[in-house]
Every structure is written in C-alpha cells, then in structure tokens.
Amino acid sequence: MAEHPPLLDTTQILSSDISLLSAPIVSADGTQQVILVQVNPGEAFTIRREDGQFQCITGPAQVPMMSPNGSVPPIYVPPGYAPQVIEDNGVRRVVVVPQAPEFHPGSHTVLHRSPHPPLPGFIPVPTMMPPPPRHMYSPVTGAGDMTTQYMPQYQSSQVYGDVDAHSTHGRSNFRDERSSKTYERLQKKLKDRQGTQKDKMSSPPSSPQKCPSPINEHNGLIKGQIAGGINTGSAKIKSGKGKGGTQVDTEIEEKDEETKAFEALLSNIVKPVASDIQARTVVLTWSPPSSLINGETDESSVPELYGYEVLISSTGKDGKYKSVYVGEETNITLNDLKPAMDYHAKVQAEYNSIKGTPSEAEIFTTLSCEPDIPNPPRIANRTKNSLTLQWKAPSDNGSKIQNFVLEWDEGKGNGEFCQCYMGSQKQFKITKLSPAMGCKFRLSARNDYGTSGFSEEVLYYTSGCAPSMPASPVLTKAGITWLSLQWSKPSGTPSDEGISYILEMEEETSGYGFKPKYDGEDLAYTVKNLRRSTKYKFKVIAYNSEGKSNPSEVVEFTTCPDKPGIPVKPSVKGKIHSHSFKITWDPPKDNGGATINKYVVEMAEGSNGNKWEMIYSGATREHLCDRLNPGCFYRLRVYCISDGGQSAVSESLLVQTPAVPPGPCLPPRLQGRPKAKEIQLRWGPPLVDGGSPISCYSVEMSPIEKDEPREVYQGSEVECTVSSLLPGKTYSFRLRAANKMGFGPFSEKCDITTAPGPPDQCKPPQVTCRSATCAQVNWEVPLSNGTDVTEYRLEWGGVEGSMQICYCGPGLSYEIKGLSPATTYYCRVQALSVVGAGPFSEVVACVTPPSVPGIVTCLQEISDDEIENPHYSPSTCLAISWEKPCDHGSEILAYSIDFGDKQSLTVGKVTSYIINNLQPDTTYRIRIQALNSLGAGPFSHMIKLKTKPLPPDPPRLECVAFSHQNLKLKWGEGTPKTLSTDSIQYHLQMEDKNGRFVSLYRGPCHTYKVQRLNESTSYKFCIQACNEAGEGPLSQEYIFTTPKSVPAALKAPKIEKVNDHICEITWECLQPMKGDPVIYSLQVMLGKDSEFKQIYKGPDSSFRYSSLQLNCEYRFRVCAIRQCQDSLGHQDLVGPYSTTVLFISQRTEPPASTNRDTVESTRTRRALSDEQCAAVILVLFAFFSILIAFIIQYFVIK
C-alpha cells in the first residue's frame, strides 16, 4: 500500500460551533446491523480498521459498517443547521436542514483543514475501502471511545436522537411487487460482481463534474447520507445550492429501478489494456460495457455511444486517482508519464449524466531512461587557492546513476568547458587556483541508458585579500529622527564573496567620536532615534575573512527639522475701520528646529463661518485686512511654515467692522402700465446695506424740463403710488435708503412718462383717381397727444358700412390698384400710437371713371334640350351663351361674335344667340367681345363647336291603351322598313302645367306607358327621332285624354241582427268624387244560390233587410257607384264589390243579450275567417313569387 499523508491534529476541527447529531438505529431483534455511510465526491471519511490503523476514504463511495451495539455514531451538524425528522413510506429519516433562510455555506470553513477523530467503534468492510483522499473529512465520529480531549467541546453541542425504523403507527417499509423483484435482481448481480472482483468497490473517485450522487460539498461543508441496512431506518444529512444561495432539500429522492439497472449496466465494464509502453507514454484501449451480467441480458436499452473517464494513480492500487481523459473514444495515448514508474489505470463509463462503477485497475510500468538534468552544483567551501563543490543526485529514471561529470571553463571565461571530475561522489575540491579567481561550472549524470543534459552554468570565485576601501555612504532619505544610508561594495570584489560592513556614526555635539551603528552584510541601513535638525558624520568599513578595509571618507548628513508649534492667537492693532483693520501675532514658542520661513493668515466671513480663505503669506508678523464689508463679522487665524513643515492653525480671532450708511439703490422701476395721472413704482434694497438693516426709503420726483425735485414718498415699503400727474408727461425719479447710520446716496434717475392719450381724429383723406383702376389716397398727421403716431390704418371698400383695411404703416399716402372702373368706393383713415388707436376720420366717397367692358366669361354651347326655338336645327345652327361682363361704367351696346367668317357677327344686348345658316357637320371656332360707347372689350376664350348631321323625321304618335291614371303610347308605325335597322333613339315629351314640354322617355323602344296621371284630363305630347346625325324636328302636338276613375272597393259591411227576421247592414261612406255624387249597391245571395241579387241602391250607408228566414245562410256585399254627368250624358261608374260577409239567421233564445252576443261572435268569427283566408293566400303568393324569382336568377341569368 502506498504511503498515506499523516493525519492532522483533529482538535482543530472539533469546535463548539458544530452540534452533534446522534442517530441510533436498532433493529427489531437487537443484533448487529450494517450501516451504509455515503461519502460525497471530493470529501473524505476517516475510520479505524481492525488492526488499529487509520484510513481515509474519499468519495464517491458507500462504506458499509457493522454496528456491534445497533447504534449509529453521532453526526456533527454544521453551524446554522438543525435536524428534522420526516417520514417516507413508513421509514423515518433524520434530515439536517438550515435554521435560517439566508444560510450561506461560504461562512463555514471549519471542515477544510483536518479530519475528525477516527471512528473506533465501527469495523469497515474491507472490500469497500477506497484509497486515501486529498482532503480528509469525517462526517461520523464514535461516541463510545472518545478521548477526554474532545469532551469539553461535546458538552456544549446538541445531541438529537434518531427514531425507530418503523413508525409508531405500525406502517412498514413496503415496495410494490415489480420494484421489489427488480431491486432483488440488482442486488444479486452486485453481490456476484463483488465475489469475482474483490477490489471493485475500492475504486478511486470518479469525476465530480456530473456525479449523480445526492451528496455535495460546498465551501468545505460536509453533506453526507447514512442509509441503514436491512430492516433498519436511515438518516440523511444533505444541503443543496439554489439560485440565491444554499438551500437544503428536505425531500428524500430515490432512484427509480430503471436508473439503477442502467447503473449496473454501466458498471459492467472490463479494465483497460495498456500497449506501446514507453518511458513517458502509453496507449490505453478498452471496450464498451457489456450488456450481459452473469449470463443475463439487461432489460434496459443499450445505448450506441458512451462517455468514458480514464483515471490513473501512481501511488498504488489504493492510492489517489486523478482524471486524465473524459470523452467518447475507446483508446487514448497518455503523455508526460514518469519513467520506471508503476501506474494503475481504470476506466469509468457514463451515459446521460449516469455513471457506473470504475473498472478494475490495469497495472503497467513505464520504461527506464537516462537520468534527469541535475541541479547546478553549489559551493561548500572556498579559500584563496581552492573551491569545494557539492551537488545532489537527480532522478535516476529506473537505472542507478554510475557517474557524475563535472566540467569547468578553467577560469578563462571563453565559454569552453573541460572535464574536471567524473565519478560517483557528490562533491569535489578544485585546487591550485588563484585568489579572487572566477570559474564557471556545470554538471551532468550518467547511467546505463545514457547521459543527462548539463545543468545550468554557475560562477564561483575563490577568496582574495582584505576588501579595498569602500566608497562613502550616500543619504537616500532623511527624516526627523532617522537617516537612511546606502553604500556599495568595494571595487574589484567578487560577486559571490561574502563581505560584511560596519557603519560608524559621530554626533558633533556629543564629543564621544565615532561609534558603530550597524554590522552586517546589507548595503543599506536606517539609523533611528536621532535628534531633529542635527548634523551627524558617517563612515563605512568593509571586512571579510581576510581582514578589514580602510574606513571610507567621512560624510556629514543632517536630520530634518520638525514642524513648528502653534502660533499665538492674532490680535487687532490700532482702530477698526469700516473696510479695514490691522492684525498682528507672535511667533510660536517652538520653531521645530528650523527658522520660520513664512506665516499664513486665513480669514472666514461670518461669526460661524467655516469657509477659510488665505489673505496673507509672508515673513512679517502683521497684516492689514482691507476691502472688507462694513458691519460684518470676520474670523482670522494664522499658521506658520518652516523647513520642517506646516504648523497647526492658531485660535481664531473674531472682529466686527463698524456699520456705514447704505450704498446707492438701483433706480426705481415702473410696476405695471403707467396711467394717465398716476404711476406705481417699485424698487429693491441697495446692494450694500452698510452693515445695518435698511430702515426706510425716500423717493424724490421732478419734471424732466425742470430740476426741482420734491419728495413724494418716505417709508419702509419697497413700492409706492405717485398720483396727480399730467398725462403724456415725463418725470424723473430717484431713490435713497437709510439705516441707523443715516441716508445713503441717491440712485440714478429714472425717467418715466405717464400714459399718453390716443391720437386725435385725422382729417378726411384726399382721393385722386389716376385711372379707371388706380387711385391715390393722401392724409395728414393728427395731434399725437403725448406720443408719436406709429402707424396709420386705411380702410377701403365698395360699401360704406363694410370696409376693410388695405394699408397699415407709417406712410401718409397709399396707391390702391386693381379697382373696378365706374365704381363708387369709400375710405377712411385712422392714426395709431403705442397707447392705442384714435377715432376714424370721416368717410370719403369717390367714383372711378368708366372704361371699356370687361372680358366675356363662361362662353359655352347651349345643349339642344335647353333650346326652345322651334326653328333651331342642330345641323345648321349653333346655340351659344355667355355671361354678361362688367360694363365698367358704360352700358354694353352690343356683342361681336367671331366664328371664322371674314366679317364678325354683331348682336344686341343678349347673353345667348343662335348662329344660323351654317354647314352641317362642320367645326367652327367661336369667340366673343362686348362693345360699349368707349370701345370694344377684350375677346373671350375660344371654343370649338361642330354642327350635327341632318336628323331623321319624327314618327306618328298614337294611344293604344288608356285608364284614368295611365296612357300607353305607341309610335313608329308606317315607318319604312329600311329605317328599322338603324339605331334610332326616340325622345318623347309631354307638356306640363306651365306649358313647357318635359322629357318623358329617351330610348329605342316604340311604346311607353305614362303613369300617375289625373283622371279626365287632356295631355299634350310630341316626339322626335334621333340618330347619329342628331335630333330630328319635333312632331306635331298630340292630345290624349284620361277617363274618369271608378270608386274604390269598400270594406266588408257590418251586420247587426235586430230580431229573428230583420238585420241591419252598414258600410263605410265615401266622399263625392270631384263633385260627382256616390251611391251604393247592396247585394245578397241566399243559401246555395249562385248569383247575387240587388236588394238596395241609393246614397245611404245602411239598410235593414227584413226577409230573413230562420236557419239560413246569407252572404252580403256592397259596392260604390259614381254618377257622372258630362257632355255625353249621364253615366254610372261601378266600383269593385267589397268582401263577402256570411250571416246565419237563428232563433233568438232568452235572454236576449246572450243571443245577441252569440250572433255577434258568430259574425265576427266568420269575418275573421275570411280575413285569415285572404292573408294565407297573400303569403302563398309571395312565397311562390320569391321562389320563381330565385329560379330565374339561378338558372336563366347565371
């Protein structure tokens, strides 16, 4: 077994901060039981074996331990943790959780340094012993064999007892049948592997990067799990790390059976095979894990690709293993190995963060080679004529070193070496050398495999004579009580020669001469405990084994002076003035050993001011403080500066300057707008109050043309109102302030003008018409009333009450352009100043001279529909219209129409004209101008018009059907068949009430039905034909007359039974129709007769029918008859009959009211039945109409 690191002192670990958790677990029969102690990756567990030796087990590992008395050793609880008992499936566990929510494991480092005392009360199973760890930890400690040195610490710890394995409720630990069988099969496979591979469980720790172990170590804290064996409970100590810090997982998670089975598969891996073994390299090859365990195939799916981790150890089979490879390859080459070294290599399989148990260790030994390069030889002794060198043997790399080869350059320094010794000894003496001679040496080693490389070259000197006189020491830095000195080696001294130095010092006032202050090999020394500002003499002596040198030349250095003491408090010298005073002060009692170079005076304003400013710096001890403010407090202090530094400040002197009258104020300012007779002034305090508060103000006023000031206000307020002033007048004001010392000077004058009045009314302006479109307006300056006129406003317009501003400015004239000729215009002018606007002048009217007419606008063609001239023909005529232009003051006499002929056409004062005698289908360019007595106006814009071809003749119009509201007209009969193929459009017109013909129809059809006409009314119609050539002439007027209308249908009559043989029939009454009387015809049909018989005809709206028979059905209906009287004679127009009403005559039963009600209800029910019948017919008709329309839309149109 390889050497283990010695155990540290365990007393460093066991402190009172770690509480003790005792977890005894006793089985039911009280016999011995196996306890599994789980060790986390990177942690260690120290135990005592049967032979009495200690062993540290590194994680991850589970150490089975046998408890002779059925109890678990005490468990140390980290500071800030507390145990908690939880129950899971009938098993109680003790879990260590943090006491505070903000527990941070970084504050607990007590377990980093040394392991706990060993556990003597438990015997570990030999097959579960891992190699010694890097860090040794012990989560459990025996309580029975604890030595007395730990007892005081344990007395202050809290001990928590574990609970029984079975709960008090009688619940037992259970698994379902499938999980139980899988667990037993895995346990059997694990035991079989332990039987064939004795040292399987003592494998080194795997890589802690992705270890699935539930035990972690954070900042040195131990989190372990103690799982009980068969029929035992378990205790678990665990803490995790969350987002914000360390969190403790109080839940106990168990791996599912599939994960356990997969771990067993990953553990079934054979050891690697070493090949191509060299001195410093080796090739390792291995195979993936086998899916067969003891002849059985694992039920879990076998992955195609594994991850592997290779672990090697050079300290024995149970030594410390380290990870050298992590990847998916099955062979690697290890480099940087040590020659002739025994190595143990293991491989561990991994898949999806699940790791198996490492394989068995493959043992291989690297080959031997030449020795390593030795270290340079070191000098053991030197004289004037010899050097004795020694060296240490390097690593022999598996073969014993036979000879050492020592080479030197013979003191020549040319870089050429020769052998001076070869042998097995480790020292050699070189003789016959010269004093102070320098030689270079190098060393190599030789064994059976070859010679190593040479070591680094070293230079050594032989001893010489006594040292020469060194140079004088140099001052590097001086202090108040110390001096730092430095010196150098004497010239010609070998670099490796050991020389010592003696530093001697003499104080000039002591009289004792030079005394040694330092004796050693250093080249610098600081002499302390000196006096300030004092001169000291120094010299240095060098010596070696041969003797002492002569002393160096004496040098003299002076210590620094100390800072001076605090100066005396300054005092006032002479009288204190308002703006200055003089102060003086005395020097400090202690000047610090140096002359005072200067004094600095600082001053702060205010009795408690802390803002100090330097006002003086110099050697004199008095100063004049000037440029001060009257009536203010000032604090003064002084400090001094010498070569030793700056002293502290003295006590402060408080001085107050006397007050003076205040300084001048700023001129008063106007507040608000000035009024005509008063102004309001406001001012502020003076910038300088003279050191005393302002008590009052005085305001004086004088007219600007006279310098006769008079006081208008005196008081403490900062504003006043001055009244009784003249408007538009300028006044001068000045101000002064007063305090307890009197009035100060006046301020500068401030000129303020009272509010002026608006300007006076301007005189009527003068208007001069320069042309028909331009006029010049002039006006004069009115009285300004205290202010200058800034601008004038000229209003101009064609209506006296509606004028607009056409000019606004300082000028006295304005030219208005763009006027209309022969037009009356009105104008007025107004003056404005900064105060306001004066009244307008009187209104002046002017008339511009007349001119030629304006340009004719809106020249356009008149459409054929708008022309009422019967002689108009679009083929030979063109109708134009225009708007009358402005006559510009002279009446328009005529218009001149230019349409392309050599001579223009002149027409009278009209706005439309028909140009006749033109050529059909010809384009003409037409323009027009107006003429008056002054001449012709400009031509209008030109338009292009074209005459139409000759149109067809109108057809003959006739009435083919008529009613009292409709007339159906037809045309086109008798037309030649050749025209039937032409695309002729027809335009039907009818005369309205005003005697004008309006359009009724325009289209290709030959019939048209005129609707919504009045009865017995004559209407005039005319028609014209149109084709591509244009519209033909209108036909002659045709007159058609509508007949009179018949009365409307009446509602169903109402029947009321009078007695068994008489009933009364009533119906609605109609008004006379246009003066024609209306009579009624009542018909009845008895029983099953097929014809109605008239029983009444007359103007009444009711009739009593007295021929009723019992138990018979009667049907009644009525119609209205219009009696007309015209030129043809008397004529009756019979309207449609009403709805038939059924009446059944029955014998009247007493009481009479009951029978009447029965007849009434019967009549009503019959009437309602007929109405319902009509409604049903109407609904059915609407439904069929919609259905037919849908069919036509879907099958015909689409």
Curated annotation (Swiss-Prot):
Protein role: Mediates spermatid-Sertoli adhesion during spermatogenesis.
UniProt subcellular location: Golgi apparatus membrane
Gene: FNDC3A
Low complexity bias spans: 202-214
CDD domains reported in the protein's UniProt record: FN3
Pfam families: fn3
GO function term, MF aspect, one: RNA binding
Ranges annotated as spanning the membrane: 1177-1197
A Gene Ontology cellular-component term: vesicle membrane
Record PTM Phosphoserine, positions in chain: S203, S207, S213
GO biological process: cell-cell adhesion; fertilization; Sertoli cell development; spermatid development
Membrane topology summary: Single-pass membrane protein
Tissue expression remark: Expressed in the odontoblast and nerves in the dental pulp. Also expressed in trachea and to a lesser extent in the brain, liver, lung and kidney.
Protein name (Swiss-Prot/TrEMBL): Fibronectin type-III domain-containing protein 3A
